[in-house]
Amino acid sequence: MEIYDINGQIIDPLAGKTLYVAGDSIAYGKGSAGGYGKCIADRYGMRLINEAVDGATLATLVPDNVNGGYRTSIGMTVKSSTELEKADYILLEGGVNDAWNNAKLGALNGSFDPAFYSGDTIGTLEAMLDDLAKKHSDKRVAYVFPHGGLFASSENWYKTYKPAILSALKKWGVPYVDIEECAPPMGAHGVSELSDKYTIDGTHPNKAGSERFYMEPIAALLKRL
């Protein structure tokens, strides 16, 4: 149902709201400053807080073989954030770097006991969702899966990581949007012509890619929350 102002203009439910984004380089906007979060914020008149980090994983203590040390954990970033109170919407994304770096996957906890093991991918994801449910239950939370073509169909993203993350989201009642379902495959296992047009390297959407494939499906989900 649309809401109108006194002049008969549609009032968008996202206008004036604050969108918090956490995730990896796709959410960070390595191919387009601010990523899809900025595209959504600009299009719908939202305020944006983007704490996504290039190269981040869900799991903790995943070695960074490029820069040394360990990769930033998305779960720990969210749990320690001082920005969440400002948010109306919390948009999460991650797991691709876990799969690429063979992070320990872990298993879905059979209960809602908060004593989760936070070192592996699923344990950290569950701990993050548990923390959001307890401390930020007034926020509207959603998850984003990226476009297809980043992995071959036989690789562990499709066999283990993505199904496990999806199961955790369903357990915690977190809605999600899967960009792979509404965009052509790009990247190493996608359509090269589209990769050249809509990404900087097959993995990271440029501004055109964020607007063409990410912005509207994510905004539509946020409006339903």
Please annotate each region the language model reported:
Residues T18-Y20, I26-A115:
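Conserved SGNH/GDSL esterase-like catalytic core that processes O-acyl groups on lipids
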Residues D54, T121-M128, F213, P217-I218:
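Alpha-helical packing segments of well-folded alpha/beta enzyme cores
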Residues P146-L225:
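Catalytic His-Asp segment of secreted/periplasmic serine-dependent ester chemistry enzymes
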